[in-house]
Amino acid sequence: MFGKGGMGNLMKQAQQMQDKMAKVQEEIARMEVTGEAGAGLVKVTMTGSHSVRKVDIDPSLLEDDKEMLEDLIAAACNDAARRVEENQKDKMAEVTGGMQLPPGMKMPF
């Protein structure tokens, strides 16, 4: 089934991929992205592990409707989370060489 050294090479490749994935996971956890809403009036900075680091609200919004401000904050958080997911997907694609995973399966396993 496997040629000479085939199984050993396969195991070596798997270990290398696992090492690369560990490095990428560390990089993802350290990265920060900023989501925006209201044309940049509300900005949310989030880490790769989805922790909100900072919320920046333009002072002009503090005079407006509380409900609108709450909606903008939620939208900015959702935008930041979407950006984190996109970055994670891109970083993992670098490691897997674009290998497609079955729907619903996330890396790491």
Swiss-Prot record:
Determine if Cytoplasm is one of this entry's keywords: yes
State what protein this is by name: Nucleoid-associated protein Swoo_1794
User: What does it do?
Assistant: Binds to DNA and alters its conformation. May be involved in regulation of gene expression, nucleoid organization and DNA protection.
* One Pfam family linked to the record: YbaB_DNA_bd
Where is the major localization of this protein? cytoplasm
Any stretches that span the bilayer, and where are they?
Answer: none
Which Gene3D superfamilies would you find in this protein's record?
Answer: Nucleoid-associated protein YbaB-like domain
- Keyword line: Cytoplasm, DNA-binding
GO MF terms listed in the record are: DNA binding
Subunit structure comment from the entry: Homodimer.
- Would the keyword RNA-binding be found if you checked this record's keyword annotation? no
* Family under the similarity heading: Belongs to the YbaB/EbfC family.
Extract the ranges annotated as region (Disordered).
88-109
The UniProt entry, under InterPro entries, shows:
YbaB-like_sf, YbaB/EbfC
Gene Ontology CC terms, in alphabetical order: bacterial nucleoid; cytosol
